[in-house]
């Protein structure tokens, strides 16, 4: 009995059989780039861009420091303003209490005077 060997299909089919070819070409480009010893225009451009990125990072660091210092000053100003408002509020309430007590004292004095006047009027009748 001769058994024909059928080409076995893989259980999982690849959607695109050119995946290996794409991987090989990517590897070839990578190896070619590694083997290049000379500086090309592209690598020079990459170095320039890298330098620009370094300058940008330095600038951003300085800006962050300035913003932090500005934020600290703003927070200190807000704290001082809050303390001043609290002092004014306390002072206002103290004056209100003092005015109320003075008003009460005045009312008592007026009441006392009125009582004396009324008592004098009664005695005169």
UniProtKB/Swiss-Prot annotation:
Molecular function via GO: molecular adaptor activity
Location in the cell: Cell junction; Cytoplasm, Cytoskeleton
UniProt keywords, alphabetically: Cell junction, Coiled coil, Cytoplasm, Cytoskeleton
Tissues expressing this chain: Expressed in many epithelial tissues, including the pharynx, intestine, excretory canal and hypodermis.
Major localisation: other
Mutant lacking the gene: phenotype: Mutants are viable but developmentally delayed. They have bubble-shaped invaginations of the apical membrane into the cytoplasm of intestinal cells and abnormal aggregations of the subapical intermediate filament (IF) network.
Region (Disordered): 79-125
Role according to the record: Dynamic component of the endotube in intestinal cells, interacts with intermediate filament and regulates intestinal lumen morphology.
Identification of the protein by name: Bublin coiled-coil protein
Source organism: Caenorhabditis elegans
